[in-house]
Every structure is written in C-alpha cells, then in structure tokens.
Amino acid sequence: MTAYSDKTNQNDNTNSKQDTGVEDWMTEIWDWIDNHNIAGSYDSSVPREPEALRQLERLDLGYGKSTSYSYIDNKSVLQSESESTEPLPSAIGHLKNLKYLRLRGFNELPEQIAQLHSLETLVYMKCSFTEFPKVLCKLKNLKSLKILSKSLESFPNEFGNLSSLTHFDMRGTQVQELPDSIGNLSKITSIELYANEALKALPESIGNLTKLEKLEIRASDLKTLPSSIGNLKQLKSLGLYHNGLQSLPDSITNLKALEQLDVSETLLSGVSESVSRFLGNVGSKVTW
C-alpha cells in the first residue's frame, strides 16, 4: 500500500523511518489494511502516509467492499469496508484521537482496543461473540454504543463499567436479560431495544438510571416491567410496542414527566385502578 509497508522497501533503515515520522505501529495498521482489502478494491484516495493515522478520528471496518480516506465534517475518516477474517492489529491502541469506531464481523479483539481513551461512539455489528467482549467494557469515555448482532446472548457484569455511556441501542440479538450492572450507568439518557426476541425482563436496577429520558423496548418477549421503573422521574418517552406485556406495575404512576407512552400490540388484559387513572391523565399521549 505504501512505501512504509511494501515488502520491497523493507530495507529502509531506522533513520529513514524517524525522518519521515513513521512509527512501527503505523506500519502495522497499514499492513493490516493491505491484507484486509479485497484485491483490486483499494481506493487511490487513501493517503499514502501512515503518519496520517495520528489524527484519525473515525474508523469504519467492514462496511462494504472498498477502502477510502476522506473528511467528514472536517474529521479524518478511514473506511476499510470489506468484512474481516483477520483479527485487528494490537497497534489499534495507538489511535489516540479516534472518536468513532465501527466493528463488523470480528471474532477476536486485541486487549489494546481498551487504550482508545478518546473513543465516544462504538458500532458493533455482526461480530460472532456470544458474550459482549469484556475488553470493550474498559472504554470508560464511550458515550454511544450501538449493537446489531444475532450471535450475542449475554453481557458480562463489567458492562456497568461504561460509566460515560449516555445512549445504548441494541437490535436483533438473542439476549434474554440485561445485566444488573446496567444500573451503574448513571449518565445514560436513552435506551433503545429493538427486535431482541429473546428478551424477557429488565433488571430491577434499571430504576437507578435517574437521568433516563427515553426507553424503547419493541418486538421482544417482555412480559412485565420491574416496579423500580417508577424511579425514572426524568422519563419522557416509554415505548413498549409489540411485546408480550400483560400488565403494568402501579409504580408507573410515578412517571410524572412522561410525555409519550406506546403500549400498542401488547397483551395487556387489565390494569389497576390507579394505573387506569394515570393513563387517563396522560390521555392522547398514550398509544394503544
């Protein structure tokens, strides 16, 4: 790909590398991208200087069938779009300015990925792990996590260590329950859970998320809500569309900030008198 990673140029001496500002970790990443690409798919717009990685803020891996380098909103963006059969290089931990990372189709991740201290957004797609990787739970500055994975079945307790998380979006998984440690995510304001057909319940610890404003649970096997949901005093939108929900807890009447409630296509067979009055007060904001 570049003179720094081309095997025909491996005789360049160390002084030459120092003069150009190229470090070994840069070459390691570009070598990986070279091997990762489908033959003939490489885009000539990708810069030939590995040192450009110093400023990289967005990395899309496994998006399509080509590689490109561009600027989006004045941010350095690298897209290596073919799905990978090779593990990420450990050198990825050197991308100190990386704020956005998209992973697709991986079955192995290096421990060094936890060194991405500037990472704010992670998109996790079609990776083959059955448990969410613990190493990703070390991303203490992560603010947004989006998961789309049919293979995923569970989360480790370490999930609660994502202390900066404000938005969590999970779709199409086989997860049956969220970990109790989700209650440690004190900054979270939005949770969206779509088409997780095996999801049966929410942990009581969900009530600890006092900054939560939006909770959407659609197309799951959810049958009840924890009574602690009444602690979500900032909750404005509660979507429970197309679930197996059979009842609503009395504590739902404590949701004074609620502006929108969707309980359409559920199995609600009856609610208590207090819940009925509450729904009446919410009025047109309720979708049945």
What is the meaning of each model-derived region?
Residues 13-16, 99, 117, 130, ...:
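Intrinsically disordered, low-complexity segments used as extracellular stalks/linkers
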Residues 46-47, 88-90, 109-113, 132-134, ...:
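The feature encodes a structural signal of leucine-rich repeats
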Residues 53, 94-97, 106, 115-119, ...:
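Leucine-rich repeat
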Residues 248-288:
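Leucine-rich solenoid repeat scaffolds
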Residues 59-61, 98-103, 120-125, 142-147, ...:
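Conserved hydrophobic beta-strand positions in leucine-rich repeat
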Residues 64, 82-83, 104-106, 127, ...:
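Conserved "Asn-ladder"/turn position within leucine-rich repeats
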Residues 23-105, 120:
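LRR N-terminal entry segment and analogous cap-like coil->beta motifs
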Residues 1-31:
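Terminal targeting and flexible regions in eukaryotic proteins, enriched
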